[in-house]
Amino acid sequence: MSMGLEITGTALAVLGWLGTIVCCALPMWRVSAFIGSNIITSQNIWEGLWMNCVVQSTGQMQCKVYDSLLALPQDLQAARALIVVAILLAAFGLLVALVGAQCTNCVQDDTAKAKITIVAGVLFLLAALLTLVPVSWSANTIIRDFYNPVVPEAQKREMGAGLYVGWAAAALQLLGGALLCCSCPPREKKYTATKVVYSAPRSTGPGASLGTGYDRKDYV
């Protein structure tokens, strides 16, 4: 695997990791749906993993941290845990990638470096899946409630920017992890012993046919 490809994969994975952190912090997983009587409302409601915010038409915003975890919907409760685990897993994957990088001297053996890089790629892939699951789950819940006639219009929500950031972060980590997993260990060179046969030098003199150093005329 070339160093350029390794750096590209690591950079994409790091961008995805930073995107996951932004996705976790943004209070815009769910936003007010301006339908029906909500069209003329003077405020916009944002709901995130840790707080909800009310934005007035004047631009003033008030945010409040959730008082109880049990008051959250199931998808947001699961999203909290999965997103935090994804962030920690990607951070550990970054440390592993730095250890196995070709530009570092933490490990001298090239084969060991390649295996460590593959482990880092797998960690980034797992982090991407842990990010993708809660984001997609929340989006599915929002869409299902939006088209549910039983849910009042005031409680219907639309997908916020946090979900789109989460999808982009998961895609970057998937791509970066896949590139790191392409790091194949170098093949070991096998040397085969070659047999060398030594033969005595053959004499080309006149007495070579008799196997002695005398000339033929000495026997006449």
From Swiss-Prot:
Quote the Pfam families the UniProt record gives.
PMP22_Claudin (PF00822)
Matches recorded under InterPro entries: Claudin, Claudin3, Claudin_CS, PMP22/EMP/MP20/Claudin
One GO BP annotation is: positive regulation of gene expression
Compartment list:
Cell junction, Tight junction; Cell membrane
List Phosphotyrosine occurrences by residue. 198
Recorded hits in PROSITE patterns, A to Z, give: CLAUDIN
Q: What are the alphabetically sorted keywords of the record? A: Cell junction, Cell membrane, Membrane, Phosphoprotein, Tight junction, Transmembrane, Transmembrane helix, Williams-Beuren syndrome
Topological domain spans for side Extracellular: 30-80, 137-159
Q: What is its main location?
A: other
Leader peptide range in chain numbering: none
Please give the residue positions where the record annotates the modification Phosphoserine: 199, 209
Note the Gene3D superfamilies from the entry.
Answer: 1.20.140.150
- Subunit details for this protein? Can form homo- and heteropolymers with other CLDN. Homopolymers interact with CLDN1 and CLDN2 homopolymers. Interacts in cis (within the same plasma membrane) with CLDN19. Directly interacts with TJP1/ZO-1, TJP2/ZO-2 and TJP3/ZO-3.
Q: What does this protein do?
A: Barrier-forming claudin. Plays a major role in tight junction-specific obliteration of the intercellular space, through calcium-independent cell-adhesion activity.
Q: Which family does it belong to?
A: Belongs to the claudin family.
Task: Tell me what this protein is called.
Answer: Claudin-3
Q: Which organism is it from?
A: Homo sapiens
Q: What is the lineage of its organism?
A: Eukaryota, Metazoa, Chordata, Craniata, Vertebrata
Q: Which gene encodes it?
A: CLDN3
